[in-house]
């Protein structure tokens, strides 16, 4: 694992493989690059002649915590673009699932110079899905800061991994003004709330429609309440020339992975099944010429 400093933040990353085509792979949730399925997907891509950067977003894994920006995903997208530029890598195929799909989309929209292509699956959307994200990612920290201050935030179970893996993160929390912290998380919370003209939280449909790179969208399952099928299909229709493809698994994949995760398995364990489809698509679309 290597560490890069991007805008004053410590960002943990690894480059896997030595192929000519570069991928930037981003997981969802607040999961690390070391979470089950992420590295395996990168290694499967590398085994097919690709080069892949996996990284810990701010607020994930061994990277620094950061509470700035209009939304958490926008902040992470800006850091990914900064990481690729600082390493003199790219442009890359920006790829990810769930929250990583949102970060990937925002990266391509906000920083077109680092994106040669875009691939997304399990794209969060819908009223239920987006409101759930707002509550999950913001509510516990807002409540803790409001009632007991920043030490209580740092003691929350959801931040235990980032503090254990990067102990300086505890000091980062304690240095934050609780009122400013609450204001930031309420802004992030608002960004998840469904708004007219925003299919994907945090980015306008008009900006998405302006994308001019090869784009792959994997259709979501009809049974998935968090990454709705309508979101994936509508997003593919918004992006000129986007390819909407069927997933390499059944309709209940997300539901079954949630059940498996409750038993200790990883949500992303089956992501490597996407690799043949990703390779076939890039071979056909030739994003890097």
Residue ranges and their predicted role:
Residues 8-64:
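Conserved HGGG/HGGXW glycine-rich cap/lid loop of the alpha/beta-hydrolase fold
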Residues 211, 217-219:
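Short beta-strand/loop motif that positions the catalytic acidic residue
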Residues 74-92:
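Conserved acidic catalytic loop of the alpha/beta-hydrolase fold
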Residues 224-231:
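Conserved alpha/beta-hydrolase "acid-adjacent" motif
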Residues 169-206:
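Hydrophobic, aromatic-rich cap/lid helix
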Residues 55-73, 255-256:
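Glycine-rich "HGGG/HGxG" loop immediately N-terminal to the catalytic nucleophile
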Residues 102-105, 109-146:
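Flexible "cap/lid" loop of the alpha/beta hydrolase fold
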Residues 241-289:
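Catalytic active-site module of serine/aspartate enzymes centered on a nucleophile-bearing elbow/loop
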């Amino acid at each position: 694992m290597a560490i890069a400093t991007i805008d004053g933040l410590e960002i943990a990353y690894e480059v896997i493989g030595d192929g000519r085509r570069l991928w930037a792979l981003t997981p969802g949730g607040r999961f690390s690059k070391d979470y089950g399925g992420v590295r395996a997907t990168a290694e499967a891509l590398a085994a097919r002649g690709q080069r892949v950067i996996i990284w810990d977003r701010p607020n994930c894994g061994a990277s620094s915590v950061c509470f700035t920006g209009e939304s958490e995903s926008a902040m992470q997208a800006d850091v990914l673009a900064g990481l690729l530029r600082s390493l003199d890598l790219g442009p890359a195929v920006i790829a990810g699932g769930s929250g990583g799909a949102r970060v990937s989309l925002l990266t391509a929209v906000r920083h077109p110079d680092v994106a040669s292509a875009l691939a997304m699956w399990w794209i969060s959307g819908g009223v239920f899905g987006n409101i759930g994200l707002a509550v999950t990612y913001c509510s516990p920290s807002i409540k803790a800061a409001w009632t007991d201050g920043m030490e209580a935030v740092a003691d929350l179970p959801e931040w235990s991994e980032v503090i254990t893996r990067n102990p300086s993160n505890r000091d980062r929390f304690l240095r934050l003004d609780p009122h400013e912290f609450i204001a930031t998380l309420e802004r992030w919370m608002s960004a998840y709330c469904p708004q007219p003209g925003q299919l994907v939280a945090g980015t306008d449909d008009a900006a998405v429609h302006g994308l001019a790179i090869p784009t792959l969208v994997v259709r979501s399952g009809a049974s998935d309440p968090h990454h709705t099928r309508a979101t994936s299909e509508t997003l593919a229709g918004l992006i000129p020339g986007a390819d909407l493809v069927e997933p390499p698994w059944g309709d209940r994949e997300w539901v079954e992975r949630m059940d498996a995760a409750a038993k200790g398995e990883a949500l992303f364990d089956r992501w490597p099944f996407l690799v043949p489809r990703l390779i076939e698509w890039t071979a056909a679309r030739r994003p890097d010429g």
